[in-house]
Regions:
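A conserved beta-strand-loop-helix scaffold within acyl/acetyltransferase catalytic domains
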Residues: 1-30, 34, 58, 62-81, ...
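Short acidic, S/G/P-rich loop/turn micro-motifs used as interaction or catalytic elements
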Residues: 35-40
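Inter-domain linker/hinge segments that demarcate the starts of reverse transcriptase
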Residues: 41-45
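Catalytic domains of carbohydrate-active enzymes, especially glycoside hydrolases
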Residues: 52
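Acyl/amide activation-and-transfer machinery of modular secondary-metabolite enzymes
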Residues: 82-86
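Short, conserved phosphate-binding/catalytic loop or strand-edge motifs used
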Residues: 89-90
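Short beta-alpha connecting loops at secondary-structure transitions
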Residues: 260-264
Length: 338
C-alpha cells in the first residue's frame, strides 16, 4: 500500500539482494511491512540498515509486518503486537461475484447499469497501454473532491487512510471508473499490481460527492469481475484494524495489560469500525487473510516509537483528545439529567 506514497524511501543492501521501504518520523525509521527479501536474509539486511541508521541516530520499528517477520522477531526477543489483518478477496471463487451471496449488491448493480434506470456505464483505463492525460485529470478530480468532502465531514481522526496521488505509478495500475447518464465520471477504483502474491490491491474505491448510492459497491464488483477474466485470484482490500490487540509478545505482563487497555480505549474513538462491515459484505477469503503486526526490535516501545506509529497511522492526537473531551462532557451531562 505505502509504495504508492512517494514520501517513503528505499534502502537497498550492498549485495542488492533485498530492500526496506521506510519513512522517518520522530527519528524513528518506520519500515512498511517485511524486508523485501527472502527470510534467511533478514539478519544481513537489518544489520546493514542498523549501521546506516547509526549515522542519523534513528531508532527502528515495523508497521504492517507479516507473520513471517513476527516469527523472526520472537526468536530475537523483540516486541510484537498484532493490530490488524489484511483482508483479501478471491475473484476466482468469490460468492458475491458468483451470485451465491450479496443479493442486495447484485440487484443494486443491475439497477445502476440499466440504461432506463441508473444509466451508469463502466470504463477501464490501463496507462501501460497508452496515457490519456484528459481522463487522468478527470479521475484525479474525483479523488480530490472525495478527499475534500471526507476531511470536512470527519469529526475525528481518519486513521489508517493513506493520502497519495493515485497516478504516481501508472504502469503498475489499472483504473476502473463509472460515468453517469450525463457522461461525467463519478466513481474511481485504482488497482495496483502486487507481485509477491501475483495479485492486486484496490485503493481507493470511491464515489464522487453527489454520485448515486452504490457506486463504490459497483466498482468493487467490477474489479473482481475484471480480475476473474484475467485469472487473478488475489485482490487485497487492505488493512482492517482489530478492535482489541491480538497476539502480543516481548512485553512484561503489567505493561502488556496497560498496552491492551490503551489500544482498546483508543480504537473505540476512531472512525474505523465500518471497515470490517464494508469488507465483510464482499465475502473475503479467510484462507487468504494474513495477520499484521507492529514490531519493535528495541523491546518495550518508548514514547518516540509510539508517537511515530500514531503519525504513520494518520491518527490525529488533537482530534482524539477533542473526542475524549466531548465524550466526557456527554457523560457528565447525562449524569446531571438523572
Amino acid at each position: 500500500m505505502v509504495i504508492l506514497d512517494r514520501s517513503y524511501i528505499f534502502f537497498v543492501n550492498k549485495d542488492r539482494t533485498g530492500a526496506l521501504c521506510y519513512k522517518v518520523q520522530n527519528k524513528i525509521a518506520i519500515v512498511a511491512g517485511d524486508p523485501l527479501c527472502e527470510p534467511y536474509l533478514f539478519p544481513d539486511i537489518l544489520d546493514e540498515f542498523k549501521a546506516y541508521r547509526k549515522q542519523f541516530h534513528w531508532g527502528i520499528a515495523f508497521m504492517g509486518a507479516s507473520d513471517t517477520l513476527a516469527k523472526y522477531a520472537r526468536q530475537e526477543h523483540w516486541t510484537t503486537l498484532q493490530f490488524g489483518v489484511e483482508r483479501v478477496l478471491n475473484p476466482m471463487t468469490n460468492d458475491v461475484l458468483m451470485e451465491r451471496s450479496g443479493k442486495r449488491i447484485i440487484v443494486q448493480n443491475k439497477q445502476l447499469l440499466n440504461p432506463d434506470k441508473g444509466g451508469i456505464t463502466l470504463g477501464v483505463y490501463a496507462p501501460a497501454n497508452g496515457t490519456d492525460q484528459s481522463l487522468q485529470s478527470e479521475l484525479m478530480a474525483i479523488y480530490e473532491s472525495w478527499r475534500h468532502q471526507r476531511n470536512r465531514a470527519a469529526a475525528a481522526a481518519q486513521a489508517f487512510i493513506t493520502v497519495y496521488n493515485p497516478f504516481d505509478f501508472p504502469n503498475l495500475m489499472i483504473y476502473i471508473y463509472t460515468r453517469g447518464p450525463d457522461g461525467v465520471a463519478n466513481g474511481l477504483a485504482a488497482l495496483r499490481r502486487v507481485g509477491a502474491d501475483e495479485g492486486y490491491h484496490i485503493d481507493p474505491c470511491i464515489a464522487a460527492p453527489g454520485a448515486p448510492r452504490g457506486i463504490s459497491d459497483l466498482l468493487e464488483y467490477a474489479a473482481m469481475a475484471l480480475l476473474n477474466k484475467m485469472d487473478v485470484s488475489y485482490l487485497s482490500l487492505g488493512y482492517e484494524p482489530l478492535a482489541t490487540l491480538g497476539d502480543v509478545s516481548g512485553l512484561p505482563l503489567p505493561i502488556e495489560k496497560i498496552t491492551r487497555s490503551l489500544y482498546r480505549h483508543t480504537f473505540q474513538r476512531l472512525p474505523i469500525g465500518g471497515k470490517k462491515a464494508y469488507y465483510d459484505k464482499f465475502r473475503p477469503d479467510p484462507f487468504l487473510d494474513s495477520e499484521l503486526y507492529l514490531v519493535f526490535p528495541s523491546g518495550v516501545p518508548g514514547l518516540r516509537h509510539m508517537l511515530a506509529m500514531v503519525h504513520m497511522a494518520n491518527i490525529s492526537i488533537r482530534k482524539l483528545v477533542r473526542s475524549e473531551a466531548k465524550s466526557a462532557t456527554q457523560i457528565e451531562s447525562a449524569a446531571e439529567e438523572r
